[in-house]
Regions:
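C-terminal recognition in membrane/secretory proteostasis and scaffolding
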Residues: 75-320
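Active-site loop architecture of trypsin-fold serine endopeptidases
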Residues: 1-10, 15-40, 46-87, 91, ...
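Conserved beta-propeller blade repeats
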Residues: 41-42, 129
């Protein structure tokens, strides 16, 4: 590239998640040109202070397309110091999968604003979260005395906190009759290398035998949990309803999780909708029919991720 070149632009977003970024990296978005040869160079503010390291561009051709991303200098400095002093990067670890609270979840659960990280799966039976008693469905709202804005924010806070450190975590739990706020002190573990995110898990579709119901609330064809499925996944047959088919023209077919993947898939098990358990298709249909345009919807959904395991998903959307 051309040496001694300076480009200028505006910052339009901070803490931006990108498809190619790691779970620990949130980028500064700018329209200052980043081309081949100056990636890795500094992003500076008007005072000449380095605020980021140019890292990525959004492009379909390989050339600059008007949007670039820089790693915040604070993150780069933390990694540098660890490499300089210890020769490796160590990150704190909770041992959970997370999703972010959206407006629909906050409305259904009576939260003042859409802040917090929902625990969708406790990953390790002997990990820090499991030892502290956290469960799927808990919402972490504070970490080490600091409010948690989202799943990504919590990941950043945990990863930048050293392993073996004890921290106080505040979380909300639905007891069935009330939302209770709890505090727990936990000792962080060290994140193992090469751990993939939940999006790497591919759902295992199990056979659905009973005849499906004719009604299609939200465009979903639902059926009861089979005895074989209940035994295989170690769940009760009344634990929810199995999604047998999704109408491609339905609203829910376009609903995405925070990670960008489809919210509902065939073989998923819907457990609750707006805090109400659903043991049969008629009950589900009655709840859906009572909803009106603009109402918030939150569903607790289990996804089979192997022959014997499931993982919780929090599906959040608004009735259109």
């Amino acid at each position: 590239g051309l040496s001694r070149t300076v480009t200028a632009g505006i910052i339009s977003h901070v803490q931006r998640d990108t498809p190619t970024g790691s779970p620990f990296q949130r980028f500064i978005q700018t329209d200052a040109a980043i081309n081949r040869g100056n990636s890795g160079g500094p992003l500076v503010n008007l005072a000449g202070e380095v605020i980021g390291v140019n890292s990525q561009i959004a492009t379909s051709t390989g050339d600059y397309n008007g949007i670039g991303f820089a790693l915040p200098s604070r993150d780069a400095s933390q990694v540098y110091e660890q490499l300089r002093t210890t020769g490796k990067v160590r990150r704190g670890y909770l041992g959970v999968f997370l999703d972010s609270v959206k407006a629909e979840y906050a409305k259904v659960y009576g939260m003042r604003d859409e802040r917090g990280a929902i625990v969708t799966h406790v990953r390790d039976a002997d990990g820090p979260a499991a030892a502290a008693g956290l469960k799927a469905g808990d919402v972490i709202v504070e970490f080490d005395g600091k409010p948690v804005a989202s799943a990504q924010d919590l990941i950043s806070k945990v990863s930048s906190t050293g392993p073996d450190r004890s921290v106080v975590v505040a979380y909300l739990r639905d007891s069935g009759t009330a939302i209770e706020r709890k505090n727990v002190t936990m000792r962080l573990g060290e994140r193992p290398p090469n751990r993939t995110s939940r999006d790497g898990d591919r759902p295992t579709k199990l056979p659905v035998d009973p005849p499906a119901q004719e009604q299609k609330p939200f465009g979903l064809t639902l059926t009861a949990i089979t005895p074989e499925m209940a035994t295989s996944l170690n769940i009760d047959r009344t634990a929810g309803l199995v999604v047998k088919e999704i109408s491609p023209e339905s609203l829910i077919a376009d609903v995405k999780l925070s990670s960008g993947v489809d919210a509902i898939g065939e073989g998923d098990i819907i457990q609750r909708i707006n805090r109400k358990p659903v043991a049969d298709p008629a009950a589900f249909g009655e709840i859906v029919r009572a909803l009106k345009k603009g109402d918030a919807v939150v569903m607790h959904v289990l996804t089979p991720v192997s022959g014997t395991q499931t993982q919780l998903k929090i599906v959040q959307f608004t009735v259109q």
